[in-house]
Every structure is written in C-alpha cells, then in structure tokens.
Amino acid sequence: MAAERQDALREFVAVTGAEEDRARFFLESAGWDLQIALASFYEDGGDEDIVTISQATPSSVSRGTAPSDNRVTSFRDLIHDQDEDEEEEEGQRFYAGGSERSGQQIVGPPRKRSPNELVDDLFKGAKEHGAVAVERVTKSPGETSKPRPFAGGGYRLGAAPEEESAYVAGERRRHSGQDVHVVLKLWKTGFSLDNGELRSYQDPSNAQFLESIRRGEVPAELRRLAHGGQVNLDMEDHRDEDFVKPKGAFKAFTGEGQKLGSTAPQILNTSSPAQQAENEAKASSSISIDESQPTTNIQIRLADGGRLVQKFNHSHRISDIRLFIVDARPAMAATSFVLMTTFPNKELADENQTLKEANLLNAVIVQRLT
C-alpha cells in the first residue's frame, strides 16, 4: 500500500510539476485516487505557475515554404478552428503518465465564463433572433405602455367606383389567455425578473432559462404565466451594477379599530356574522317573557348601524334593554352609551322606570355613544 502511494505521489509530481507536499495534500484529499487528485488540482488552479512543454513538430513531415499572407483556407483549417473553440468550452486536456504505448488523458473542468461574456452572449443571441434595442423612455403619468389596436367598426371601401361602401362591425378581440409583460434585468452577478429576487448565473437551475433567452425563445416559466396569451419580454443591461433589492410595496393596514375625530367614536364590530347571530340569539333567550302578561316589541337602533327587535313585558325596565344590548354586542360592554327616544328626541335617564311608565310600548329606541 505504501509503495502504491509512493508511485502515485511520484507520478503526480511528474505530471503537474508541483511540490511533493502539495501533491501529497491533493492525493490525501482524493483518497489517493490519482485521477481525482489531478482533476482537483487543475480545478483549483494549481497549474497557473507551471510551465507547459510544447511538443516538437515531427521532422518526418515536410512542408514547403509559403508566403505569410496565404489567403487559401483549407477544410482542415476550418476543422482545426472548430476544435480550438470546442477545447475552450470543454476545458484543458492533460496527459497523465503511462508508458510509450499507454497513458491516460484527463480533461479539466470547463472554463468558467465571466458575467460580462454571458450577458454579451445573451444580448447577441436575442438580436440574432429579431430583438430590437430601444432607448429607455420616461413615460408620462397618463401614458399607457402599449398602444391598443382599433377595435371599432368602419366602412369597407369598394374596389370599383360603382360599388357601394358597406359598414362592417368591429369584432371583439378574443383573449385565450392573459398578456404578460416581463422585464429581465441582467446584473453583475445574476438576473432578476421585474422586482423579484436575484438569481445567479452559475445556478444550474437557471441554465435552461438563460439558454432559452440566448436562442431568442420565451422561457417556459414565462409562457406558463401567460396561460396561452402573449409574453412581452424586455431586457435591461445592468451588468456594471450590483443587484439592489426593490423596496416592498406599501401595504395598508387591514385590521380593525375605532373611528376617531368625533365626540362619539364609532365602534367597529369585530365579530363575524355567524358569531354576531349567535350573540343575538343568546341575548334574546336571556330575556324572560311572561306570556300571561302584556307584551310589546321594542326596536333598537345601535350605534354601529345594526338593528335589534326584541319582545318585552310591560313590566320590564329600561335597564333590561341596556343589558340586552350588551349581551347582543359584547364589544359594547366597556363602552359608555345612553338610550334615547326618537320623537321626541329625549334621553332615557331613569333606567329604573318600566317600559309602560316611560311610555315605550312599541317604541323605537336609539343607542348613542358618549
């Protein structure tokens, strides 16, 4: 085992030209797997300071002298140029040891493209497929972002003078989906859609999206948003700027509270309709009615805009009406209010009076907050 590790160490040093301590570090990190260690070494940029030895041109191949400005390009030259482009995308190739007739070739990781190159490629691909560069124009407040086509009726002109013009009614535009307008912003380290979050250029999950843009196609995730409608995509170049998270839209308070600004603030009901109906039923059942005694119906107009109608005996007191209101609207238990008649408008100050004594039989009572 030790001999195999020593052989791997010597071969690593021979291939990379690295120091023995550094070679041992990469081999130990790779579990003494020579291939993985070499790939890790070159991916880490360990070959930056190593001088590569150029291969000598075979002497057996004779070439005639040709002028330096030779304008004839052979098919072999085209293949050679294509191979060079593929090698730039694929990564550098390395030869790992072996004998005269055997050996192993290791392909390094692909060359990472800078964000500037990536953005240039996206704009270039979009222009090749019909995209048009436009200047950013500031819109007036009343200006729409997109002109609407004429959709009214009109007269169809005849082809000959003797033909009469016929009125043609306009057809309504049929929408199979909804039109979507999206702004793609290309930043220094990533891109964003409209006011969304930053998405990295290097994230594999974004590769298909960017490739669709480069081919001049609308990405699938944007087509799904339109549900069959038209997708208008604008691209903005911000490659020299760092991503700035947009400010969140203002969201108004949606809770409940009291209306201020008057001597008698309006109490906003916080109960749901079902809870309110349950409270009113409990309040009605809490009033004990003696059917053998005379009864009357009292209508109560509440300060929150509600209305209650309850049966009482003539012997019930005004204080019983107050308790009924509090049971029907528990939120008013801690609220100061008075009860008043409508015509004439008079406060019922003595709540110990019976309904008959206060002349409130079949009357309308109004609740007023104090």
Swiss-Prot record:
Domain SEP intervals: 179-244
Residue numbers of Phosphotyrosine PTMs: Y167
Residues with PTM Phosphoserine: S74, S102, S114, S140, S176, S192, S272
Principal localisation: nucleus
Domain UBX span(s) in chain numbering: 291-368
Keywords from the UniProt entry: Chromosome, Cytoplasm, Cytoskeleton, Golgi apparatus, Lipid-binding, Nucleus, Phosphoprotein
UniProt xrefs under InterPro entries: NSFL1C_SEP_dom_sf, SEP_domain, UBA-like_sf, Ubiquitin-like_domsf, UBX_dom
Gene Ontology annotations of biological process type: autophagosome assembly; establishment of mitotic spindle orientation; Golgi organization; membrane fusion; negative regulation of protein localization to centrosome; nuclear membrane reassembly; positive regulation of mitotic centrosome separation; proteasome-mediated ubiquitin-dependent protein catabolic process
Region (Disordered) location: 54-73, 80-116, 137-157, 272-292
Function: Reduces the ATPase activity of VCP. Necessary for the fragmentation of Golgi stacks during mitosis and for VCP-mediated reassembly of Golgi stacks after mitosis. May play a role in VCP-mediated formation of transitional endoplasmic reticulum (tER). Inhibits the activity of CTSL (in vitro). Together with UBXN2B/p37, regulates the centrosomal levels of kinase AURKA/Aurora A during mitotic progression by promoting AURKA removal from centrosomes in prophase. Also, regulates spindle orientation during mitosis.
Stated name of the protein: NSFL1 cofactor p47
Gene transcribed to yield this protein: NSFL1C
